[in-house]
Amino acid sequence: MTRYVFITGGVVSSLGKGLASAALAALLQARGYRVRLRKLDPYLNVDPGTMSPTQHGEVFVTDDGAETDLDLGHYERFTGLPASRADNVTTGRIYLDIITKERRGDYLGATIQVIPHVTNAIKAFVLDGNDDYDFVLVEIGGTVGDIEGLPFFEAIRQIGQERPRGSVCYLHLTLLPYIPSAGELKTKPTQHSVKELRSIGIQPDILLCRCDRPIPVDERRKLGLFCNVRESAVIEARDVDTIYAVPLSYREAGLDREILAHFQMKPEGEPKLERWQNILERVRNPEGEVTIAIVGKYTGLKDAYKSLTEALTHGGIANNVRVNLEWIEAEVFEREDPAPFLEGLHGILVPGGFGQRGAEGKIRAARYARERNIPYFGICFGMQMAVIEAARSLAGITDANSTEFGETREPVVGLLTEWMRGNELERRAAESDLGGTMRLGAYKATLAEGTKIAQMYGDTEISERHRHRYEVNMAYRECLEAKGLRFSGTSPDGLLPETVEHEGHPWFIGVQFHPELKSRPFEPHPLFKGFIAAAIEQSRLV
């Protein structure tokens, strides 16, 4: 029988429901159970693909091309299980599907209502395709009391009524704030949050309490009494120094044991957490450190680069060093000399992005790395800016630019719906070979033998995830390669450039895809492993 755990949040947002869900899944995996993770997002957007990264954080892209919430990245990194479009749904997607069916006449003239039509659609999503799993963990985005979340809470309430007794658990993540003047943790916000949850028909079975210090026995007893849960079900979720300590912290607090007790399942031995202990040891006790500059466009919200920062951490784990990050807004380099900001650093990473803002700053960062022989890693937009820099500085194409920024005489970078014949832009229809305007999901690529990137992968055939509208123009390949910028990887048909590298440079690589989306703490991505290794070599020179 499949068992369902619904993870809700209260008191404040951004408590870490995604990490809590991922950590619980890791603990259940460590006990040998088959686990699936799913996310319900109450916002009205169909998906986060068009949402501002400075508001919502990064868009996590799955192998099958879904643009999803960043929490799915946590799910993949902690469990090693690939997510798909079937693991994330929004209010916008639910309503779009229902309205499409209504316009088609599928409801045979019925009045379409939130109950039962919207709630039934949510239930169908949650319950679909779970027969092969022991546990399905479902995170509900937002906070209890949000108006847009009500249909989702009603749907999971109904699931609890309709499923066999003992097959559903409601876990509520909440906050116990410490008030210095009173010298104590306050339970009242949690009591009110649970009261709100109970008012819509859901009695939490387990309270997972975020706090920065131990919960006194009296406070734990009070929470159990007034929130109507067992005292043993009040679980301490203490703040930790790294997210990779969370599974072990939850294990110590007894979360996995309480979950099994709720389902009346007898634990068989102890969870196998050796690999988590090894990772934590490497994170907390590195043998050295390097400093990497991230020259980005959305540095005001670090969640905009969540997978990227974690992938850099994984690269550090692989090389047993701590990776320190220097966040630099790309626009700064359009006004100021990059040298004072970048001198003494051990690597420069220019990540993806959209739009003209900060583009020239990223180009200047690429030039600085090339001229000073500093390791450079350009991802998506970062690769495109590196190619434009090479075209201008090495090939003498002074007007080289991207059509993303307007008309240009030298379209070194163009839309996927455009193709170049010489310097002429040929418009491509959406149904032509190059597809639509956004290249999403996993695509295969072929790497040239003997290149630095092929050596790092240990293979010439790879598959990586993409999210971009623009591509480097292959018409410029010959003149750029003559100046030392090698097109080291292409699509299998040879039409689209996937990777470039500067020959003669210690480590200068650009990739059109997003390798950070496939990096795991237990399987660091080879490019991040190689980039940090190059940064270590650079640290010995400065």
UniProtKB/Swiss-Prot annotation:
Activity regulation, short description: Allosterically activated by GTP, when glutamine is the substrate; GTP has no effect on the reaction when ammonia is the substrate. The allosteric effector GTP functions by stabilizing the protein conformation that binds the tetrahedral intermediate(s) formed during glutamine hydrolysis. Inhibited by the product CTP, via allosteric rather than competitive inhibition.
Q: Does the keyword Cytoplasm apply?
A: no
GO molecular function per UniProt: ATP binding; CTP synthase activity; glutaminase activity; identical protein binding; metal ion binding
**GO biological process terms on file:** 'de novo' CTP biosynthetic process; pyrimidine nucleobase biosynthetic process
Which pathway is recorded for this entry? Pyrimidine metabolism; CTP biosynthesis via de novo pathway; CTP from UDP: step 2/2
Write the record's keywords in alphabetical order, separated by commas: ATP-binding, Glutamine amidotransferase, Ligase, Magnesium, Metal-binding, Nucleotide-binding, Pyrimidine biosynthesis
The catalysed reaction is: UTP + L-glutamine + ATP + H2O = CTP + L-glutamate + ADP + phosphate + 2 H(+); L-glutamine + H2O = L-glutamate + NH4(+); UTP + NH4(+) + ATP = CTP + ADP + phosphate + 2 H(+)
The enzyme's main class, written as a single word, is ligase
Instruction: Quote the SUPFAM superfamilies the UniProt record gives.
Output: Class I glutamine amidotransferase-like, P-loop containing nucleoside triphosphate hydrolases
Q: Tell me which residues bind UTP.
A: S13, K186, T187, K188, P189, T190, Q191, K222
- Stored CDD domains: CTPS_N (cd03113), GATase1_CTP_Synthase (cd01746)
What's a Pfam family in this record?
GATase
Which InterPro entries has this protein been placed in?
Class_I_gatase-like (IPR029062), CTP_synthase (IPR004468), CTP_synthase_N (IPR017456), GATASE (IPR017926), GATase1_CTP_Synthase (IPR033828), P-loop_NTPase (IPR027417)
What is its biological role? Catalyzes the ATP-dependent amination of UTP to CTP with either L-glutamine or ammonia as the source of nitrogen. Regulates intracellular CTP levels through interactions with the four ribonucleotide triphosphates.
Q: Which NCBIfam families match?
A: PRK05380.1, PyrG
Assembly description? Homotetramer.
The name on file for this protein is CTP synthase
| Originating organism | Methylorubrum populi (strain ATCC BAA-705 / NCIMB 13946 / BJ001)
The gene coding this protein: pyrG
